[in-house]
Amino acid sequence: MSDAEICPQCGWAFDTEALRANSCKKCRSALLITSVAYLEKFDRPAIQKYIARNSEVLRHDPEDQDALLSMGLCYLRLGLFELAEKFLGRLIDAHPEAASGYYYKAIGSLRGRRPRVATLNAIRAAEQLLLTAITLEPENGRHDIVLAAVRHDYYIMNGLRVPNPSPGDLVEGAEGKHLDRNEIGQGLALMNIPESSPFSPGLFATQT
C-alpha cells in the first residue's frame, strides 16, 4: 500500500471498507478530516500527525481536495488562522465547487474574534463566504445557522440594521435541512460565540 493508505494516528494500513466508514479499524480515529468536529477530542500532538500525513499527500498532489481541507481544519482547530486561511484559500482556488472551503474560511476569517467586536469589513467578508456556501450546498443547514449567528451577534447585539435574510429567516430556512449539532457548536466556539447565544446547537433537538 502507498503512504496515503496508512492511518495518520497509528500507522495501520487501511482498506476501502475502512475508508468508506472513515474510521481506522485499529485505533478508531477518523482517516479523513472532513469536519472540525472530528478534531474535538484530539490534542495538539495528535493533530500534528494529521498535518504531517496530509503535508506528504500534498507534496505528491498539491491540489488534493481532502488533504487541503484537512490541513485547513487542523490549523483552524489549533488557532493558527493565517495557516488555515492559506490552505482553505488553496482549496477554494482548486475546487471552487466545494462548499466546505467557503464555510470554514468564513469561520477562520474572524481570527477567533467574536463577531460582535469584529470590523464591518470582516463581517461582510464572512457573510459573503457563507452565502456562497449556502448556494453551493443548500441542503446543509450549518451554513444558514452560522450565518444567522454571525448576523445576530454583530448587527443585533450592536444595535445595527440587519441585512436580509435576517437571522430568523435563516433559521427558518434551515428547517428540514441536515443539521449536525456538534459541527455547528464547534463552528460557533471557534468564533467565540457564547453558548448562551440563541443560535446554540442545543436549540436543534433533532438532526435531519
Q: Can you describe what each PLM-predicted range is?
A:
Residues 1-49:
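Long, contiguous interaction/recruitment modules in multidomain scaffold/adaptor proteins
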Residues 19, 62, 96, 138, ...:
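Short coil turns that delineate tetratricopeptide repeat
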